[in-house]
């Protein structure tokens, strides 16, 4: 499977996400989406952390199997900066990257007092649903300003990576398609399968062995 030919797949988007199997073990997986909306598991690679080197190894594997790096595709990632860095280094600085909105909302609300979580989640969802990326960005910046006094540590988290959070809004995609491509949910099904299989593995060996 990890050596299968990818050259005939007409992929328009690729989702990449890390799967934490054990504290010291992470698998980085990729799923492609073609023009018909069909999902294609592309590859999984083992790494100690979700580092640039691990992400680069996965991308190099995909290219070596026929993925054309000159074709512009949307990449959806879980938010790890190392992934975005490796993608842009490999596919070009203008490659569109969408950071998972669900991961982002979870990271923000988990740092808030419970009484504030629902209202912040609603505001973020309202921003995600906007067709106009500039209006969405303004709404999120206003939220960050409102939280500056009540939860000062959360402000930077809200604003961090804001451009990549709104990529699908900026691309002007239809609402239904935008919701599908704004998060890494497609890959979560594959991640769940990998986790179930890995629970039965008693002794892990290096992938090169």
Language-model features and meaning:
Residues 72-81, 86-123:
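Conserved beta-strand -> loop -> alpha-helix junction used to position metal-binding or nucleic-acid-contacting
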Residues 106-141, 147:
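Surface-exposed, charged/polar loop-rich segments
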Residues 130-209:
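Acidic/histidine-rich catalytic cores and adjacent linkers
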Residues 1-76, 81, 85-86, 90-93:
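RNase H-like nuclease fold core
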Residues 21, 98, 203-207:
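Alpha-helix N-cap/helix-initiation sites
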Residues 33, 61-65, 86-93, 111, ...:
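Conserved, well-folded catalytic cores of nucleic-acid-processing
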Residues 9, 24, 52-56, 69, ...:
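Amphipathic alpha-helical transducer elements in NTP-driven molecular machines
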């Amino acid at each position: 499977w990890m050596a299968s030919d990818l050259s005939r797949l007409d992929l328009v988007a690729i989702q990449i996400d890390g799967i934490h199997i054990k504290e010291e073990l992470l698998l980085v997986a990729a799923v492609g989406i073609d023009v018909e909306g069909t999902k294609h598991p592309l590859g999984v690679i083992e790494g100690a952390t979700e580092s640039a080197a691990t992400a680069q190894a996965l991308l190099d594997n995909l290219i070596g199997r026929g993925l054309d790096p000159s074709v512009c595709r949307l990449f959806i990632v879980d938010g790890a900066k190392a992934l975005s860095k490796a993608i842009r280094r490999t596919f070009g600085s203008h490659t569109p990257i969408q950071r998972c909105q669900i991961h982002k909302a979870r990271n923000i609300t988990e740092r808030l007092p419970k009484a504030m979580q629902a209202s912040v989640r609603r505001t973020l969802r309202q921003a995600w649903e906007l067709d106009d990326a500039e209006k969405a960005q303004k709404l999120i910046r206003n939220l960050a300003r409102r939280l500056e006094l009540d939860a000062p540590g959360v402000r930077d988290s809200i604003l961090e990576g804001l451009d990549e959070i709104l990529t699908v809004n900026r691309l002007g995609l239809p609402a239904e398609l935008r919701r599908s491509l704004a998060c890494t949910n497609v890959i979560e099904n594959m991640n769940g399968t990998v986790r179930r299989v890995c629970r039965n593995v008693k002794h892990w060996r290096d992938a090169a062995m």
